[in-house]
């Protein structure tokens, strides 16, 4: 829907040398998405790079989330390095299954919490986005 509405859609691509996520614009998913890092679908290297400063919202994966927006990632640190460089106005949204919601996830001072956590059962956590 976002592409059909003329929105710029960017997906992450792993840069193995820097261990960072590059944000790449996709226009035609059938053509622009290829097997990438560890066989995961990601934008082709030829796709245009998108500046982190232009991001309005980001969908963040994880193993578990808590009801305060805490997130337990997969251990690679890719989103831990991406989230701090996004503009503060960018909404951080986690999509998860209800089984991934726990009482509390371990956290460190550098961890960035999610603004919204959504499951198949509905919104689990949301904070106002006035930034």
For the regions a language model picked out, list residue spans one by one.
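Surface-exposed, charge/polar-rich loops and edge strands
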Residues: 29, 44-49, 53-58, 66-70, ...
């Amino acid at each position: 829907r976002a592409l059909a509405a003329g929105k710029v859609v960017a997906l992450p691509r792993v840069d193995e040398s820097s261990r960072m996520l590059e944000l790449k614009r996709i226009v035609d998913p059938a053509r622009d998405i290829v097997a990438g890092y560890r066989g995961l679908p990601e934008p082709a290297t030829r796709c245009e790079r998108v500046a982190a400063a232009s991001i309005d919202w980001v969908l963040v994966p994880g193993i578990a989330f808590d009801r305060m927006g805490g997130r337990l990632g997969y251990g690679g640190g890719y989103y831990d390095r991406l989230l701090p460089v996004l503009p503060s106005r960018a909404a951080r949204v986690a999509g998860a299954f209800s089984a991934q919601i726990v009482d509390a996830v371990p956290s460190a001072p550098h961890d960035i919490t999610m603004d919204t956590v959504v499951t198949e059962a509905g919104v689990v956590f949301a904070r106002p986005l006035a930034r």
